[in-house]
Amino acid sequence: MAAPLVLVLVVAVTVRAALFRSSLAEFISERVEVVSPLSSWKRVVEGLSLLDLGVSPYSGAVFHETPLIIYLFHFLIDYAELVFMITDALTAIALYFAIQDFNKVVFKKQKLLLELDQYAPDVAELIRTPMEMRYIPLKVALFYLLNPYTILSCVAKSTCAINNTLIAFFILTTIKGSAFLSAIFLALATYQSLYPLTLFVPGLLYLLQRQYIPVKMKSKAFWIFSWEYAMMYVGSLVVIICLSFFLLSSWDFIPAVYGFILSVPDLTPNIGLFWYFFAEMFEHFSLFFVCVFQINVFFYTIPLAIKLKEHPIFFMFIQIAVIAIFKSYPTVGDVALYMAFFPVWNHLYRFLRNIFVLTCIIIVCSLLFPVLWHLWIYAGSANSNFFYAITLTFNVGQILLISDYFYAFLRREYYLTHGLYLTAKDGTEAMLVLK
């Protein structure tokens, strides 16, 4: 399987290198769908200029990246294009090996449940085979590397790509069962963009599964392991933040990065849900509604943990999608990360209800973004309502798509234990309805 992966990597790097050398690179780097005030390469360059002059990069209201990122590019500024191509390649490789190991765990668990007669007798067609799962890791790498969203993000040199790499390595180390490395990469991802904090719960649930520790409030082993993992995570985060202070000799980065993410002061249009509402809102209402909007990312973690505690990797997939939809400054690079997981759930396609319509909605919206932006900003024949309407449609399409996957997953799990052909009490055919 190594040769096909290398081929995919070569094709992906070639496409990116060609686009970097084309006239499209400058155009892509300015697209509001691809970069945000947090991830814009131009803002990184401005921060580097201030740093070279001996001025704090956070002294203005332009740079909002983390100190480790600015010091990374302080030394690698001349190789920025190569750094972003390597970053994408590392993300794909990490996802490839993560899903390869995950499939082994899934098949082993499925085999055990079959031996214990935990499945209904008429669900043979729902059982996954090694041949069916063989090419899934390669498809995941393919979906990530050749996704137009990922390519655009790389060519624009959006720092979202680095965040995706950290999350991918968090997933890999979690599936490998390394609690220490998992905590470190989760801390790095949280340090980079704050929202990956919500991935702590699915990561912990998976590691508990690997240790055969039951998720029970009365279990001493559960609390001991949870405390150890939490301490490794918090300790890593504290070390990273202290290192940032050591580099800058200042705490200015905390309000400039995390305060900026949470308070949403820059209302530059993007593909998110925040900017239009707060541009139209009176200032004295904004704090309340910022809290309401921000809580969406964190609110679903507990109910999802309760419902999907036996399936932490699917929980992780849903949570990454929730972050991509509800974060304050999303870009298409965030969307590309959870889309890479679609091949992992290819066994759910038969249960998806609206996959064709929702796919069409997302594709059409992606094509209309630059059109409506041009009509609004350059032609003057449209206004912000047009652009926000397509943004809202895009996000509703994502929400419905993820909801469809969630429904399909629960439906398949129900069929596995209760049988594929359900009957009502009177013997007639029954239909499964999710409420």
Swiss-Prot record:
Q: Give the recorded effect for L95A.
A: No effect on function in GPI-anchor attachment to protein
Which parts of the sequence lie on the Lumenal side of the lipid bilayer? 23-78, 245-286, 373-384
InterPro entries xrefs: PIG-U (IPR009600)
Effect on the protein of changing R411A:
No effect on function in GPI-anchor attachment to protein
Please state the pathway this protein functions in, per its UniProt record.
Glycolipid biosynthesis; glycosylphosphatidylinositol-anchor biosynthesis
Any one GO MF term held by the record is: GPI anchor binding
The residues listed in the UniProt record as binding a cardiolipin, with positions renumbered to this chain, are K216, M217, K309
Q: What is this protein called?
A: GPI-anchor transamidase component PIGU
Q: Which gene encodes it?
A: PIGU
